[in-house]
Amino acid sequence: MLRVEGALARSQATDGVIPATSANEIAAVCTLTHPNAEQLLSNGWEAGTPVLPLLDYVRSQLSPQGLPHLHYLATTQDIVDTAMMLHMQQVFSVLESLAGNAAASLTGMSRYGDLPIMTRTFLQPAEPSTFNLRLTHWLSPLLDAMEAMREARFPLQFGGAVGDRFGQRWSLTLANELFLHPRFIPWHTDRQPVVDLVEIIGRLVRWAAKVAGDLVFLAQSGEATMRAGGSTAMANKRNPTDAIRALAAADAFHGVASIITASRPHELERAAGSWHAEWFAIPLIAQTASATLDAVGRALESLTIHSADVVVPPGRAEAASLLASATLDRSRDILGALHPWTMEDNSVQGNIT
């Protein structure tokens, strides 16, 4: 939020809305860290928005000349929503990295491609094939989700008190400074931009849960082994711990994501309660999604596939090979273009996971 307030002042000075001296002073104060973040959050909950106590802190550091130009023509939701988009950029950067690690592990598993497997439909043995088939069905949806991440938009929120942009001079300056999409129409009660981002994350989590569930089943049947956890009661047990962790985190994700995706509509020009609930959800969405991808990635890193005692018809082997070849080529292209999202803080992964 401090970053947004500082960028707002700088952009308004660039556009001639406030004096440059005030903007420089505000921006300098906004580079400071709040001395008590926990107290800020507590006061923000009491005040109804964390922006109010944050502005009190910034005002205490400003000269009388700079005070009138702080938070000029903005409303609290502008600051919170824009800060949330900056946070979501960081979340996507972490998730893209974790997804890339998983895709790389799967791509490396092409070494098992020709191993015979027994396919299963409705969990029952079906037809012999090769691991190329299963590899394709694991990897292709992940690549789809990664491409959806690349197309995601993180819009600026700047609508003023009631979302009519009254008195504001619109320019691209603020959006460009924050590397956000310059959406002209405010979205105070149109939460589709937030829903869209959460649903993209949901695609990754659903993919991870599907693969983790498959790994648990294959570990049970002895068709795959991976890093195992022990048991306090049964020394012979070797539990597929990483896959289990991924399933648990995915279940938790869907619970907190529903706060966004199943929210009641936001009323009129500014919502009462539904918007505030997002503050609880977004950090938990980031934590549970990254935990899911991290866990399934660790499972894939240690995964060994075992050959089934079946004879694969040549035609089925060829069909599976063709599917895998196209998917692996696509994976190598996507991994080759993998790059971090534009953002200032690349250390966020440790804070999220």
Q: Where does each model-flagged region fall?
A:
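His/Asp/Glu-rich acidic catalytic environments and adjacent acidic regulatory segments
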Residues: 1-27
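Glycine-rich, N-terminal phosphate-binding loop and its surrounding beta-alpha-beta segment
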Residues: 19-74
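Non-transmembrane, amphipathic alpha-helical segments
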Residues: 39-50, 71, 80, 84-87, ...
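Internal glycine-rich alpha/beta core junctions
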Residues: 49-68, 97-100, 127-266
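Conserved phosphate/anionic-ligand binding catalytic regions in large, soluble enzymes, centered on
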Residues: 74-84, 162, 209-210
